A protein has these predicted regions:
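Helix-loop-helix connectors at the membrane interface of multi-pass transporters/channels
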Residues: 107-121, 143-161, 249-272, 305-306, ...
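Extracellular/periplasmic helix-exit of transmembrane alpha-helices
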Residues: 202-212, 265-308, 378-382
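Hydrophobic, membrane-embedded alpha-helices of multi-pass small-molecule transporters
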Residues: 48-64, 201-207, 215-278, 321-333
């Protein structure tokens, strides 16, 4: 429990110390925000700061800080280090600066920002890449909550699939304050309750968790080498490119720029804490007899761990409330993913989104593609894993593009660009190595993949040095 407690304290200190430093680098000011300058009553409108935080937290959470942390815990105590350092120095910086850059550029989406700083050709690639990623999120986050709801209610799973998909359609189309602004705080309460309740259980039980000084060796070699596989497995709890597609939604609702640190940096730190709690619960589950206590096996899947631990530790009512939080996380990420896709396409096509007819013109093709991926997910026994594995790599690759965009911005503004350059180089190397070593890609040996990692790192650094020399 010592490593876990120190990790929690480190995340809190990271928000108050490093978060304040990153804010001072950006220098928020009193200029009008997009919510005021471009108010349209649909996507651009002022919302209360606490509500924006709740929505941002749910938008970025998904199942990543829960399922990802559970799967990542199997690697051992190294998961603690990645969650803490990744969250403070990479993920929260990525989320804050991408959100604030969107504010400064009128609330535009990620492809527009990438195009402005990395060029029009990169923007076109990013547009297709981002929309496909968001549609994958929509498809993946329909079926998994339907299974949990089916178990809770004993209703047919396909009925829940239909209900959630219909909700996606409505939430994607409606003004942001009509549905998302009203029900998200309730969903966020369930998710936060789950994390706080499990945190309390950990301190009451005081289990003998693996500590950092026990060694950082890979305790789950079947999942691949710690580098890069741990850094892809635990994404949303440390850094996630998907977040940069969600931050512009809230950038369009902020009253003033000073709200940025608690909303963007703070939501990421909160997500890191959720990931840390689940990684610790899972470490107890896998390594200290927790599996026997809740009546499950060491090889249980992430959803099985969630269900078993929630019901056993929190009782019937608490377990149901906790599971509702787990259900709310993917549903609320799925609907805002499709909403982001609509807005990104509308920006590219210059479609005014106030008339509902023009919203429909974009939404219908998006829903058709999402439904096809959903059908593949359901019809194939391994469909979820196939989509999820590609999503995991695509998600971190998106973070790479965002970090390089932020680095170019900081260089041009003559600000300390090192805060994004180091994460950009690291994540570029992670994604390149994963592409080499992963069975879903080239499946090369670890030795060859690490040689490729060195080449990717040196090439990326060389590209940056060459580009930087042209900026003086």
């Amino acid at each position: 429990m010592i490593s876990f407690t120190l990790s929690l304290i480190a995340l809190l200190l990271g928000y108050f110390l490093y978060g304040r430093f990153v804010e001072s680098v950006f220098k928020p000011d009193s200029r009008p925000t997009p919510a005021i300058a471009k108010a349209d009553g649909v996507d651009f409108m002022v919302l209360p700061g606490w509500k924006i935080f709740m929505i941002q937290f749910l938008n970025i959470a998904g199942t990543g800080p829960i399922f990802g942390a559970i799967m990542g815990a199997k690697f051992g105590p190294a998961a603690y280090l990645w969650i803490v350092f990744g969250c403070i120095f990479a993920g929260a910086v990525h989320d804050y600066l991408s959100g604030m850059l969107s504010v400064r550029h009128g609330g535009v989406g990620l492809p527009e920002l990438v195009g402005y700083y990395l060029g029009d050709n990169t923007k076109k690639v990013m547009l297709v890449f981002t929309v496909l990623l968001l549609v994958m999120v929509g498809a993946v986050f329909v079926y998994s909550p339907s299974i949990i709801l089916g178990d809770l209610t004993h209703w047919n799973v396909m009925l829940w699939v239909a209900v959630i998909f219909i909700y996606y359609i409505i939430a994607t189309m409606m003004p942001i304050d009509k549905i998302i602004g009203r029900i998200y705080p309730l969903f966020a309460f369930s998710l936060i309750f789950m994390a706080v309740a499990l945190l309390a259980c950990l301190f009451v039980k005081m289990p003998n968790l693996p500590e950092l000084w026990d060694g950082l060796e890979n305790r789950n070699p079947a999942a691949g080498p710690i580098f890069p596989c741990l850094f892809i497995t635990i994404a949303c709890g440390a850094i996630s490119g998907f977040h940069a597609t969600q931050s512009p939604l809230m950038a369009r609702c902020m009253k003033h720029e000073k709200q940025g640190r608690p909303i963007f940096y703070g939501a990421m730190i909160t997500e890191g804490m959720v990931a840390l709690v689940w990684a610790s619960v899972s470490a107890y589950f896998f390594y200290d007899g927790g599996a026997e206590e809740v009546g499950s096996t060491l090889k249980a899947s992430a959803p099985q761990v969630v269900t078993a631990v929630s019901n056993s530790w929190l009782g019937t009512f608490g377990g149901v409330l906790a599971l509702l939080g787990v259900v709310a996380a993917p549903i609320t990420s799925g609907d805002t993913a499709l909403r982001s896709a609509r807005l990104i396409v509308s920006e590219f096509l210059h479609f005014d989104q106030k008339p509902i007819a023009k919203r429909l013109m974009i939404c219908i093709p998006l829903f058709v593609v999402t439904s096809l991926l959903l059908w593949f997910n359901i019809a194939n026994e391994d469909g979820f894993n196939v989509i999820w594995n590609y999503f995991g790599w695509a998600n971190q690759t998106l973070a790479v593009f965002t970090l390089w965009t932020l680095t170019v911005y900081l260089v041009r503004q003559k600000k300390p660009y090192i805060i994004t350059l180091i994460p950009a180089l690291f994540m570029t190397t992670v994604c390149g190595t994963f592409l080499a070593v992963s069975p879903i890609a080239f499946g090369l040996s670890t030795t060859v993949s690490y040689i490729i990692a060195v080449v990717v790192f040196l090439f990326s650094l060389g590209w940056f040095v060459r580009w930087y020399s042209t900026q003086k």
